[in-house]
Amino acid sequence: MKIGIDLDGVIFDSEKLYRVYTELYDMIELGKNSKKDNRELKFQDRFDWTDEEKNNFLDEYQPEIISQANYMPGAKMILKKLKEEGNDLYIITARGIYNEQIIEITKNIFKETGMDIFTKCYWSILDKAKVCKDENIDIMIDDSKYNCESIANAGTKTIYMKDAPSYDITDNPNVVTLYNWGEVYRYLHEMN
């Protein structure tokens, strides 16, 4: 099976770190209380920041967040098991759009932790549905409601990995919502 996998909020717990750092940045550094909607996944949509404030946040904190992020519970074990079982694992991520240094940091983390196991990595991707279609991905795992709906609407089965306050997807037969890597593993085996 060809499995597409997002990084932030799926393999790494970086989304939780983004939430902590953005709250502190908003309250302490900017002296604001500008949260708009906590259910939004992207901090750019959660806060009422100027483009300059968003870019300053990314420049100052993104490398630190990526370096500090841990693997989601069970992610390493399940991904290695899926690889051993003959599945092809594809990283399909937006990581690297704002800062290419993040790509090298991530590659080094994979090497240092014995997770250099992916068939192919797609970095700085905005249109994940196109990559899934072009690579004939059987199922994509992502934590973004928008990405899951877009990918599913293009015909690729999708696992919506929820681990934070966010919107639900209830009306798309190509999307299943799961909450941890144990559930993902069970679901993938039930698909076969």
Map each language-model feature to its residues.
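Metal-dependent phosphoesterase signature
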Residues: 41-77
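Acidic, Mg2+-coordinating phosphoryl-transfer loop and its flanking beta/alpha structural elements
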Residues: 137-176
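Short hydrophobic segments within beta-strands
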Residues: 6, 92-94, 161
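Short amphipathic alpha-helix with an adjacent loop that forms part of the alpha/beta core around
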Residues: 133, 183-192
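Short acidic-hydrophobic, aromatic-tinged amphipathic segments that line or gate anion-handling sites
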Residues: 120-124, 174-183
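Substrate-recognition element of Asp-dependent hydrolases with the DxDx(T/V) motif
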Residues: 64-70, 75-106, 121
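Active-site neighborhood of HAD-like aspartate-dependent phosphohydrolases
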Residues: 1-55
